């Protein structure tokens, strides 16, 4: 992939992205840089952090009495007040960013985190293909190299903040990193998708096997999800959602009983029977009671999750 054109992204970043603020933490970015042929620097220091990413090329990073080799996918950290120097005979393609924590706008926890970074023994880290810091930096530069409008400024800001956090995490001492990844509960995420699908398609049959196939799982697995996480069967959940939708339409619209039945994928006869069993009243009576201005409450035989007590008609 040709990356030289990404260098122009630094223009937009330096124009629009300097203060990065999120809950509990704020960073000030002094400058963004990109150079396709970076050779040698003088021995120098900064009053802030500077992190560089080697996109291409080879060279050396010198700090104190140590020399660190640089090659493609190396990121290296220059800490405040540390004398350092970059050398390359053939030229390095570098992305770099200079930033510091705005302590007066950040929590004590974040001040501690940055102190841990300052004390970190890590100076250079070799990234593997596909690791977040490298991908985020290339994505940010790609986005910044495009014509920028108001919407793009928000994208640049959020991408920049994500990149800074990813870089900081990379240089934290191992002792400060979680020793084990937290388990990812994929079942809850899947169930959320299924529930949204059901609620958005109540006029459809929503058979268990069809919905399971839509989400590339077995019907048995889908049944277990509903039983384990919601304590109801799949069919009961679908029926409850349909009746809940019908009750909302009866209270808030002038649709006929037939039209409401069609909205939830039922025949009029089946809708009337199921609604009466669930609510304790026929659809017609439910509507008339709800619209009766003298009626202050409507008691249902089987209280249902979202059915509210009826209020006086205004």
Swiss-Prot record:
Species this protein is from: Bacillus subtilis (strain 168)
SMART domains given in the database record: HTH_ARAC (SM00342)
Pfam family membership, one: HTH_18
PANTHER family tied to this protein: ARAC-FAMILY TRANSCRIPTIONAL REGULATOR, HTH-TYPE TRANSCRIPTIONAL ACTIVATOR RHAS
PROSITE patterns: HTH_ARAC_FAMILY_1, HTH_ARAC_FAMILY_2
Residue ranges for the DNA-binding region feature of this UniProt entry: 209-230, 257-279
Keyword field: DNA-binding, Transcription, Transcription regulation
GO molecular-function term, one example from the UniProt record: DNA-binding transcription factor activity
Domain of life according to the entry: Bacteria
Domain HTH araC/xylS-type: 192-289
Protein name, entry field: Uncharacterized HTH-type transcriptional regulator YfiF
């Amino acid at each position: 992939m040709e990356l030289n054109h990404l260098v122009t992204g630094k223009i937009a970043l330096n124009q629009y992205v300097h203060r990065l603020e999120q809950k509990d933490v704020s960073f000030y970015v002094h400058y963004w840089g990109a150079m396709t042929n970076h050779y040698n620097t003088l021995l120098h220091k900064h009053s802030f952090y500077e992190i560089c990413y080697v996109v291409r090329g080879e060279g050396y990073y010198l700090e104190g009495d140590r020399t660190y080799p640089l090659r493609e996918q190396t990121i290296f950290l220059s800490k405040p007040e540390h004398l350092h120097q970059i050398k390359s005979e053939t030229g390095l393609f570098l992305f770099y960013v200079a930033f510091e924590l705005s302590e007066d706008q950040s929590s004590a926890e974040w001040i501690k985190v940055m102190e841990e970074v300052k004390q970190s023994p890590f100076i250079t880290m070799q990234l593997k293909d596909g690791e977040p810091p490298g991908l985020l930096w290339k994505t940010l530069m790609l986005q910044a190299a495009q014509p920028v409008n108001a919407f793009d400024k928000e994208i640049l800001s959020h991408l920049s903040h994500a990149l800074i956090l990813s870089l900081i995490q990379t240089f934290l001492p191992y002792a400060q990193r979680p020793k084990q990844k937290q388990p990812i509960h994929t079942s809850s995420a899947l169930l959320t998708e299924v529930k949204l699908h059901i609620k958005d398609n109540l006029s459809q049959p929503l058979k268990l096997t069809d919905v399971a196939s839509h989400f590339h799982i077995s019907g048995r697995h889908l049944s277990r999800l509903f039983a384990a996480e919601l304590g109801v069967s799949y069919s009961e959940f679908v029926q409850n959602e349909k009746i809940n939708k019908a009750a909302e339409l009866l209270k808030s619209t002038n649709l006929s009983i037939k039209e409401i039945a069609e909205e939830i994928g039922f025949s009029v006869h089946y809708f009337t029977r199921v609604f009466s069993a669930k609510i304790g009243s026929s659809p017609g009576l439910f509507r008339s009671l709800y619209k009766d201005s003298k009626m202050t409450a409507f008691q249902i035989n089987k209280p249902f999750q979202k059915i509210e007590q009826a209020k006086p008609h205004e």
